[in-house]
Amino acid sequence: MVYIAVAGGSGMVGQEIIDALVAKGKHQIVLLSRKDAPKETLPDGVKWTKTTYDVAHLVEVLRGVDTVLSFVAGPADPTNKAREDTQKNLIDAAIQAGVRRFAPSEWASAGFDHMFWYNYKSDIRNYLIEVNKDKKVLEYTLFQPGIFTNYLTYPFKSAKRIQQLGLPFNYHERHAVIVDGHEDAKITLTTVQDLARIVAVAVEHEEEWPRVSGMNGGNLTIRQVIELGEKVRGGPFTVEKLKAEDVKAGVLKTSRVSKATHPSIPEEEREAAAPVLMAGILMGFSSGVFEVSDEWNRLLPDYKFTQPEDFLTKAWAEIDAGATEVSIEV
C-alpha cells in the first residue's frame, strides 16, 4: 500500500490516473482540491480534502503521505502565476511533511519551446533543482508520454476521461496542417491508458525514480503520422504546408484552425486562443519537443506498450462501423 496525495485530480489526465490507482485496490489516496467534496460517494480508499494550498495546511494534510502527484492546471496565460505558486507550496509542504516522492504537473512534452502556456512547468523544474541543490530533500520525476495517441480519434472518445482535443492532424477529416520542411521531426505517441498504468506501477517502484520518466508507445515522424492516418482511414489526406516564419509570427495561412477546447480555456476566450495555440503546437511539433525518452520502457521491459498503429487501426475500424465512442481495450 502506498499513501498518495493527488493535487488537481479533477482534470482529465488526473482522473485517468486516479482510476488506475483505485483499480489496484490497495492504495490510500487523498484528493486535494479548492472545491467542496462531490456529492457522489468516493471509491474505497479515497478521501477528499478541501484546501487553499496554504503551506501550513498542506503540511498537516501531507503528513504520512509517501507520494504526491500534481495535475495542477489553469488559464493559458503566461502572466498568471497561480499554477506555479500552488506547486511551489506543494513542494515546500511536501519537504516539511517528510513526503518521499513528488511528480510535478508535466504529463506531456520533453521541452516547451514555442508553447508559452507551459512556462510554469519549466519554472517548477527549476524550482525542484533549486530545493535539491545542496542535498536531496525530495525525490521527483517528470512523467512525459508525448502526445496521447487517443487524440487521433478526434472527435470520437477513445478513453474514459480524456476529452478529445483537436490537433493539426485530423484523421476524421483526412486533413493535416504542418510546417513545411519539418516532415521528419519526430513525435512520441502514447495512449493515456498506458500512461495511467505506468504511473500506477511507478508509485510502487522500490528503486529511486529516474529524474525524467519518459514512456514511449511509438516514435513517428510527422510524415509517418500522416501516412498512418491514410492507412487506417483508407484514403489520401489533404496536407497544408505552412511557412515556419509565418507560423512563428502567428499567421496561419490555412483553411482550418484546430478548435481550442481544453477545459482550462474559458469558452469566451477559445476563438481568440485557437490560432495562438495551434501556432505554438505546430512549432512545438516541428522542433521535436514532443519526442520523449523511454525510461519506463527500459525499466519495465515486459510491459507491452500499445503501438499507435494497433490502437488506431482498431479504433477507426469501430468508428467506421458506426461507433460514436471507441470501446477499445488496451
Can you say where each PLM-predicted feature lies in the sequence?
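A conserved mid-domain beta-alpha-beta active-site/ligand-binding segment of alpha/beta enzyme cores
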Residues: 185-196, 273-286, 301
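Short, amphipathic alpha-helical "lid/cap" segments that border enzyme active or binding sites
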Residues: 91, 192-200, 305-313
